[in-house]
Amino acid sequence: ITPIAKDAFVFFVNKDNTIENLTLEQIQQIYSGKIKNWRNVEGPNIEIIAYQCPTNSFTQAGMLKLVMKDKMMTPPQDSLNSSNGNIVDVISQYVNQNNSIAYSYLYNANTMYKNENIKFLSINGVAPTYDNVKNGLYNLQTTYYAVVKKGVQENSNVSKLLNEIKNEKGQEIVREAGYVQNY
């Protein structure tokens, strides 16, 4: 098992929402139904619409593992009716509501379907920037791995490919593709 790239789990709101930062605890409270109004997190006096992804999605699994941990989520007010590969529909459904919050992986939200009408929130005062993810300052992140069968020979094509992914050129391709370099 070899780490090859990183990605951040991000929260986003409409660009006109005044909120810039939330703590992990505030996000857990929003998604567990304990915080229901933006005024409770120093925002405007308006109800929060907390979108959730489908229960069988990779993104929802990330939400449960990285963010909610052992805390229960409330049933969704609104669900992002999308598979992981169709997040553009999610964002287009979401954009025009200033009181909404949603989540995704940075790669999906920022690279595949970049949308100028959303902004990413800082979590615990740390923005989900490339450098903050690479340096481990932004904590909500995942690592992608290459899994190779044990006993693969050093001069095999598999080993050569893995070495190419790990070298400077390979990691630059990782970055150009929209992920965060691991090395």
Which residues does each predicted region cover?
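Exported/periplasmic ABC-transporter solute-binding proteins
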Residues: 1-183
